[in-house]
Design a protein with these regions (language model features):
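Serine-hydrolase catalytic core recognition
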Residues: 1-187
Length: 187
């Protein structure tokens, strides 16, 4: 609800920036940052580029996948990649800042991070969300393979250094992938 007829106060965050408070002018849509709690620290940190990529799945659907590159990324070098497996099983991989699963921190250690919005995550329609129900080792796991296979085909990925990470349902996913990955992953 607006605090007056033309202004909203909101929190905004991204993979590269923790929560800050902003004002949105409802008339001209101007956004003004009100808090700068993390500015001094963030000004000293180089974040990796975040890329939104739509990857084809094994059943020919498009899946939003976030790619986070290491800071100072050089496309002429080879990088290891980490597949981020979201928990839940029904919570989306959005532009979020996390102290627990900070994808920028992982990228800062030289990894390309692959974070797909596999089946079972909301925000992509009811069919996409419900597909996982009763099919935990099914299409959503194929979605993970689609994401890592698409990214490992890039010339800057060392396909002999692929890993997968996750907790909660993401941890279940790691164990499932460990038994079915056909030698894709090393860790």
């Amino acid at each position: 609800k607006p605090i007056n007829d033309n202004q909203l106060i909101v929190l905004q965050h991204s993979f590269s920036k923790p929560d800050e408070i902003y004002s949105i002018n409802l008339n001209d849509k101007a956004i003004t940052e009100l808090s700068f709690e993390n500015k001094e620290t963030l000004d000293q940190i180089t974040m990796g580029k975040v890329e939104e990529r739509w990857i084809a799945t094994t059943d020919n659907k498009k899946m939003l996948t976030w790619i986070i590159y290491p800071p100072h990324f050089d496309p002429n070098k080879k990088y290891p990649a980490l597949l981020y497996c979201q928990g839940g099983p029904q919570s989306p991989v959005s532009q979020f800042w996390s102290y627990r699963w900070n994808l920028q921190l992982m990228a800062a250690n030289g990894y390309v991070i692959v974070a797909p919005n596999r089946r079972g995550l909301y925000g992509f329609g009811q069919e996409w969300l419900e597909q996982i129900s009763g099919d935990y080792g099914g299409q959503n796991m194929k979605d993970y393979f689609s994401a890592i296979d698409a990214v490992k085909a890039e010339p800057f990925i060392d396909e002999n250094r692929l890993g997968a990470i996750g907790a909660s349902y993401g941890g279940f996913s790691i164990y499932w992938l460990a038994g079915h990955h056909q030698k894709r992953f090393k860790a």
